[in-house]
Amino acid sequence: MNQYVIAIDQGTTSTRAIIFDHSGAIVSSGQMEHEQIFPKAGWVEHDAAEIWNNTREVIASALSKANLTRHDIAAVGITNQRETAVVWDKTTGEPVYNAIVWQDTRTQDIVDELSKDGGGDRFKQKVGLPLATYFSGTKIKWILDNVDGAREKAEAGNLVFGNTDCWVLWNLTGGVDGGVHVTDVTNASRTLFMDLETLQWDEEILGIFGVPRSMMPEIKSSSEVYGTVHTSQLLRETPVAGILGDQQAATFGQAAFETGEAKNTYGTGCFLIFNTGEEIVHSKNGLLTTVGYKLGDAKPHYALEGSIAVTGSLIQWLRDNLGMISSAPEVETLAASVKDNGGVYIVPAFSGLFAPYWRPDARGAIVGLTRFVNKNHIARAALESTAFQTREVLDAVNADSGVPLTELKVDGGMVANDALMQFQADILGVPVIRPKVIETTALGAAYAAGLAVGFWKDLGELSSNWSEDKRWEPQLDQAEQERQMRLWRKAVTKSMDWVDEDVK
């Protein structure tokens, strides 16, 4: 009995439930994609009701495949796409608008307006983040300002906000029938509203945004029992005991618990997190300061993060928008058929540029095209753009920390691509290491939940679960490395200053 932990991984493109055993191995999983809604250029939405329905389906699927019941599950952990904002009516359980996704850029006017008084970094010392469309705060304000009746309902105390962790937890624990309205410190640190030192909502910033305090969930640690699954659900009476935003969860799943350890997750975007321990480090090089994790009553661990908006989604774009490939894995075959990129560089600034530039005026660019270039070169350039962007973030981490990283742990869907991982090692000049369990995001959430209920006893036990699967050593000489980075940086400059009054 109680031999397993289940993690709900509510991601940007799909929702998964993964069951882990005590060794951290995957026992079974269920997965369902949800619709990507693009009402206008720059707008990205999800149907929150669809996400909740899918969550129930994937839990059932994972249990069924392993022939398990709720009696076999010690705890539930939740991990999620961060920043994606859901606002719902707590009396009906209905969202007042679609979830506005982290990639969405519709709130640029709000960012510009708020930046007039004190600049884009006016809140950064307190919350660790620049003013940007990326974070939840501007999305909540947009919903209150633009959805009929939303502000009135919010001020009457009927509307609540949560990222998708909070939305799933609220529904899982009963919804309108006593659902728990809680988030953890890692998700709260991505709203623009949480004070990094007090780990509480900042009343002054909420006031500036015009967001009622009553909308905000209670902030708790990443590893404690928040409540139990409602009696109407398959996992009824199972404790929900861990929540981590997806990138922090991946860091935790990689057992990067010590100061100076880092990981890079390759998914829809790329996210490099560098553990700074109990110290809050403010970046001078375009990185975010965020909460890494907090276990129960222990002190929080902080991190520097380099967030890259578009990596894996560039491959989706080649497939879905251009029809250049019919499945994502094809891109590796095409890329491997040419010896280099043919002089082509792709800067996938579909939503502007995130770290380390923070340039919302940038848009996607393909540069260096000649008659010689074919689709194989384009495929290679698409993969290489992920590695180039990661190198720029790693350079920023090294500059901020003063201690150059000697290796990079990697995870996420794209790390199955050997060609990309080799090029990543080449362009970084340090070894790249893939663990045996690459589902580190879900594993991190499972670990947080399991620790809270005593399924695992301490971090040492989790560290002993980690094992290396493959390592890529750099094979490119430094002169060629720097030549390619010089051309990449030149390409990046070509993507900037595109958006103005004529081009939105």
From Swiss-Prot:
Catalytic reaction(s) noted: glycerol + ATP = sn-glycerol 3-phosphate + ADP + H(+)
Pathway the protein takes part in: Polyol metabolism; glycerol degradation via glycerol kinase pathway; sn-glycerol 3-phosphate from glycerol: step 1/1
CC annotations in GO: cytosol
Single GO biological process annotation from the record: glycerol-3-phosphate metabolic process
NCBIfam families from the UniProt entry: glycerol_kin, PRK00047.1
Family per record: Belongs to the FGGY kinase family.
Record's protein name: Glycerol kinase
Provenance organism: Pseudarthrobacter chlorophenolicus (strain ATCC 700700 / DSM 12829 / CIP 107037 / JCM 12360 / KCTC 9906 / NCIMB 13794 / A6) (Arthrobacter chlorophenolicus)
